[in-house]
């Protein structure tokens, strides 16, 4: 794209969760129109978009119909469970997919992005193999060795992941992976367990023109394969940061297009090891809602539209901590907000999800402080004060 586009533009958002909601808000602040699409009604982004559509995004015909109905300027995937082969067809027919249809197709499945990174680009990753049945998983686990990590090739927010310590845990890991998979895949990836010091996300911004940009690295902690807290900046050495940026640029250049990419790494004293990549805003990047002059959603929007990004300024140590449901419920309410909001240097975002299940992420607490450790403690304190009530 040679020049910035003329506004307003129309975005078809495929996936309408909390990340899509923040992107929609960013888009609307510049007067754009958003059609929010998801498989269930009243999803978070639908509550702020001009138009909502409920379809199965794994149904290629339904996906094509909604695209042709609205004729969007941009198709912006926000989740994994999309019939990405249809996006390739739509792009070939003249529709613009962010970052590209091919990038979306590759990264929606862990096997494809892993093959690109490890085999084609020569990037250091954990040793890995695949399984499509319990019997295969038992065999592959023995070959990789214990402990190892089992993940569905297609899932979101770490769902279905397990650390397998011995052969007796393989069957449980298979069941968890299949239950946590998105889409219609029954394939898992088995990785060697990396004894890392730190997991980070490096938010990487590709522009249609101009250099690739990076946010300060974001550290994060996971439980049940899902993000629980994140903080910025993560304490990397100059050597580690340079290695991470070089790898992120190599992989995102191979994918092409424009927008923000969440590139995940394991950090050890000796190595920077590529883990995963999402071609869109990243859940751990919600800390940027308080930590940067331009948050990840605004950066994604500017990159898509070819608008200038003169400076990405990290405004001080910051952290996020998730607010989770403890049990299932169809009617939600929240207590403790008055107590939570008394803390200086903090904020709370409740996503507006219509129902709950155990450990579902319903909101996030944000905090800034004099140090990363203090910000992490403060964000956790605020998150714990918000009580999710279900009926």
UniProtKB/Swiss-Prot annotation:
Keyword annotations: ATP-binding, Ligase, Magnesium, Metal-binding, Nucleotide-binding, Purine biosynthesis
Binding residues for Mg(2+): 264, 276
Pfam families tied to this protein: ATP-grasp (PF02222), PurT_C (PF21244), RS_preATP-grasp-like (PF22660)
Binding of ATP, residues: 110, 151, 156-161, 191-194, 199
Gene Ontology biological process terms in this record: 'de novo' IMP biosynthetic process
Assigned EC number: 6.3.1.21
Residues binding N(1)-(5-phospho-beta-D-ribosyl)glycinamide: 18-19, 78, 283, 353, 360-361
Protein name: Formate-dependent phosphoribosylglycinamide formyltransferase
HAMAP family per UniProt: PurT
NCBIfam families to which the protein is assigned, alphabetical: PRK09288.1, purT
Subunit structure and binding partners: Homodimer.
ATP-grasp domain: residues covered: 115-305
Recorded family membership: Belongs to the PurK/PurT family.
A Gene Ontology molecular function term of the record: phosphoribosylglycinamide formyltransferase 2 activity
InterPro entries, A to Z: ATP-grasp, ATP-grasp_carboxylate-amine, ATP_grasp_subdomain_1, PreATP-grasp_dom_sf, PurT, PurT/PurK_preATP-grasp, PurT_C, Rudment_hybrid_motif
Native source organism of the sequence: Synechocystis sp. (strain ATCC 27184 / PCC 6803 / Kazusa)
Gene from which the chain derives: purT
Biological classification of the source: Bacteria, Bacillati, Cyanobacteriota, Cyanophyceae, Synechococcales
Recorded catalytic activity of this chain's protein: N(1)-(5-phospho-beta-D-ribosyl)glycinamide + formate + ATP = N(2)-formyl-N(1)-(5-phospho-beta-D-ribosyl)glycinamide + ADP + phosphate + H(+)
Pathway note: Purine metabolism; IMP biosynthesis via de novo pathway; N(2)-formyl-N(1)-(5-phospho-D-ribosyl)glycinamide from N(1)-(5-phospho-D-ribosyl)glycinamide (formate route): step 1/1
Keyword match Ligase: yes
Function text: Involved in the de novo purine biosynthesis. Catalyzes the transfer of formate to 5-phospho-ribosyl-glycinamide (GAR), producing 5-phospho-ribosyl-N-formylglycinamide (FGAR). Formate is provided by PurU via hydrolysis of 10-formyl-tetrahydrofolate.
The keyword Metal-binding is annotated on this UniProt entry: yes
Any one cellular-component term (Gene Ontology): cytosol
């Amino acid at each position: 794209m040679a020049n910035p586009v003329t506004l307003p533009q129309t975005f078809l958002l495929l996936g309408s969760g909390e990340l899509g909601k923040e992107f929609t808000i960013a888009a609307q602040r510049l007067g754009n129109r958003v059609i929010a699409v998801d498989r269930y009604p009243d999803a978070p982004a639908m509550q702020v978009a001009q138009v909502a559509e409920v379809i199965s995004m794994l149904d290629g015909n339904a996906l094509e119909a909604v695209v042709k109905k609205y004729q969007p300027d941009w198709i912006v995937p926000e989740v994994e469970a999309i019939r990405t082969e249809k996006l390739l067809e739509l792009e070939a027919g003249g529709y613009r997919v962010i970052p590209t249809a091919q990038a979306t197709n590759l990264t929606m499945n862990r096997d494809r992005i892993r093959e690109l990174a490890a085999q084609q680009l020569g990037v250091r990753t954990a040793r890995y193999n695949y399984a499509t049945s319990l019997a295969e998983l038992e065999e592959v686990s023995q070959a990789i060795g214990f402990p190892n990590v089992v993940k569905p090739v297609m899932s979101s927010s770490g769902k279905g992941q397990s650390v397998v310590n011995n052969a007796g845990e393989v069957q449980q890991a298979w069941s968890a992976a299949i239950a946590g998979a998105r889409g219609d895949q029954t394939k898992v990836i088995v990785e060697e367990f990396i004894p890392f010091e730190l997991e980070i996300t490096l938010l990487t911004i590709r522009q249609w023109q101009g250099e690739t940009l990076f946010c300060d690295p974001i550290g994060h902690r996971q439980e049940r394969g899902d993000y629980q807290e994140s903080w910025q900046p993560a304490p990397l050495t100059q050597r580690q940061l340079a290695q991470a940026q070089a790898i992120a640029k190599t992989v995102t250049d191979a994918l092409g297009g424009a927008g923000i990419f969440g590139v995940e790494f394991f950090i050890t004293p000796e190595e920077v090891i590529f883990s995963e990549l999402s071609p869109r805003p990243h859940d751990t990047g919600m800390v940027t809602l308080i930590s940067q002059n331009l948050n990840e959603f605004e950066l994604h929007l500017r990159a898509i539209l070819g608008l200038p990004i003169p400076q990405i300024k990290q405004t001080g140590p910051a952290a996020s901590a998730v607010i989770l449901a403890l049990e299932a419920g169809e009617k939600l309410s929240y207590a403790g907000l008055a107590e939570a909001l008394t803390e200086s240097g903090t904020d709370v975002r409740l996503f507006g999800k219509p129902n709950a299940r155990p450990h579902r992420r319903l909101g996030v607490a944000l905090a800034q402080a004099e140090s990363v450790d203090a910000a992490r403690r403060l964000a956790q304190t605020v998150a714990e004060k918000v009580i999710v009530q279900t009926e």
